[in-house]
Amino acid sequence: MTNADPHELQKFSDLAHKWWDPNAEFKPLHDLNPIRLNWIDAHAHLPGKRVVDIGCGGGILSESMASLGAQVKGIDLATEALGVADLHSLESGVSVDYEAIAAEALAAREPGAYDVVTCMEMLEHVPSPANIVAACATLVKPGGWVFFSTLNRNLKSYLLAVIGAEYIAQMLPKGTHDYARFIRPSELAHFVRAAGLQLVEIKGITYHPLAKRFALSNDTDVNYLVACRRSV
């Protein structure tokens, strides 16, 4: 059975035409993108690397990594979003190979094929995040990097990421997140180690409402990033 929630796929497919509008529903992803891109590149040195972006959606991060000189494959099961990603790639002239395939299926087909694996803002939308982490570990080459970003599960994250972002500030559509699927850093660290990866860094992302911008921080209470490596 596919490790995907049909409701989640439909939710993102319905918004597919808005992926590349920096002032619409995906504005937070556009605002987050430079921060996560620079953080990934600082660790993995993207130019010339073979990268797979799992849960790539409309291709915001995929295209950015390709623009830095990486050879990027983007995968997702939301086919409408992939269609938008393909079209934008043609318009921008930035080459990305997109495919509608599950992470587990790609891992079975191409084990150890990638220097870098990214899985950003995706784990909190699937029934079994541990299986996605395991697929990422299978896809990456020995010595390669795996990057995750997700949301912590606590009262603060519920108030800020759900009530604040979806209902008060309306930065995100209502129902974007299911709080029960948020993942504590300790839980993700367990998934990472169980998959045979070495945890290198956990970094928080903080939103500054007055400046209306995101920044890296040591506060992992809400949004956080995880960098891992597969041992040689």
Swiss-Prot record:
Listed PANTHER family: METHYLTRANSFERASE, UBIQUINONE BIOSYNTHESIS O-METHYLTRANSFERASE, MITOCHONDRIAL
Gene3D superfamilies: Vaccinia Virus protein VP39 (3.40.50.150)
Keyword Cell membrane: no
UniProt gene name: ubiG
Known role: O-methyltransferase that catalyzes the 2 O-methylation steps in the ubiquinone biosynthetic pathway.
Molecular-function annotations in GO: 2-polyprenyl-6-hydroxyphenol methylase activity; 3-demethylubiquinol 3-O-methyltransferase activity; polyprenyldihydroxybenzoate methyltransferase activity
InterPro entries: SAM-dependent_MTases_sf (IPR029063), UbiG_MeTrfase (IPR010233)
GO biological process: methylation
Similarity comment: family membership: Belongs to the methyltransferase superfamily. UbiG/COQ3 family.
Keyword S-adenosyl-L-methionine in record: yes
The protein, known as: Ubiquinone biosynthesis O-methyltransferase
Short name of one Pfam family: Methyltransf_23
Pathway the protein takes part in: Cofactor biosynthesis; ubiquinone biosynthesis
Residues the record lists as binding S-adenosyl-L-methionine: 36, 55, 76, 120
Enzyme nomenclature, EC number: 2.1.1.222, 2.1.1.64
EC top class named in words: transferase
Keywords: Methyltransferase, S-adenosyl-L-methionine, Transferase, Ubiquinone biosynthesis
Catalyzed reaction equations: a 3-demethylubiquinol + S-adenosyl-L-methionine = a ubiquinol + S-adenosyl-L-homocysteine + H(+); a 3-(all-trans-polyprenyl)benzene-1,2-diol + S-adenosyl-L-methionine = a 2-methoxy-6-(all-trans-polyprenyl)phenol + S-adenosyl-L-homocysteine + H(+)
